[in-house]
Amino acid sequence: MAESELFERGLQARRDVLGAEYVDANLADTDEFMMAFQRVVTEWAWGYAWSRPGLDRKTRSMLNLAILTALGRPDELGIYVKGALATGVSVDEIKEILIHATVYCGTPAGRQAFRAAHEALLAEGVLPRPS
């Protein structure tokens, strides 16, 4: 099946933010059943929402960090920390977003988010490893 223009635009945005290696690995590990989900995510989240002109990718990345903290999704948050760095969000900005979200979402959600972000930042080599 030929992919739609929305899918292609979304795929490019997704690769730009999350990294081609991560995105391509997800798609390669997808069977026909799960491809329905991949299409929804790629076309609507990335091809539509992430590709709209109203907000830049850095701002969208910052919003995602706060939203994923509020939802209590540290597994996804770690992935989006890498994306935030790719869109120009600094380590200090990530920390401030998580502090602000902790105040409104509660300390359990904040703690999960800080841990996930810390692991992701260590993995990206932008924080020194504790000795």
Q: What are these model-predicted stretches?
A:
Residues 41-45, 62-69, 97-102:
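Short alpha-helical scaffolding segments that buttress acidic/His motifs in well-ordered protein cores
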Residues 82-85, 99-102, 118:
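Short amphipathic alpha-helical surface patches that mediate protein-protein
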